[in-house]
Swiss-Prot record:
Residues 23-43, 72-73 form a propeptide. It is found in: Secreted. It comes from the Eukaryota. This is Dermaseptin-1. It comes from Pithecopus nordestinus. Residues 1-22 form the signal peptide.
């Protein structure tokens, strides 16, 4: 009976250690995924600001060209 109790205790202890290690690895993976998501959102934000600036400059240039064309008439 004592042998059975020790075996069960050992199995439970090893299971808890294994579970603890798995959860720690899971947390590390989630942290890495969050960093990747943050990097991707920063890239998208930078891309959209660049597109916005190019569009703004194009609109200003088009407006100046239109005013110049109206002024010549």
């Amino acid at each position: 009976m004592a042998f059975l109790k020790k075996s069960i205790f050992l199995a439970l202890f090893l299971g808890m250690v294994s579970l603890s290690i798995c959860e720690e690895e899971k947390r590390e993976n989630e942290g890495e995924e969050e960093q990747e998501d943050d990097e991707q959102s920063e890239m998208k934000r930078g891309l959209w600001s660049t597109i916005k600036n190019v569009g703004k400059e194009a609109a200003i240039a088009a407006g100046k060209a239109a005013l110049g064309a109206l002024g010549e008439q």
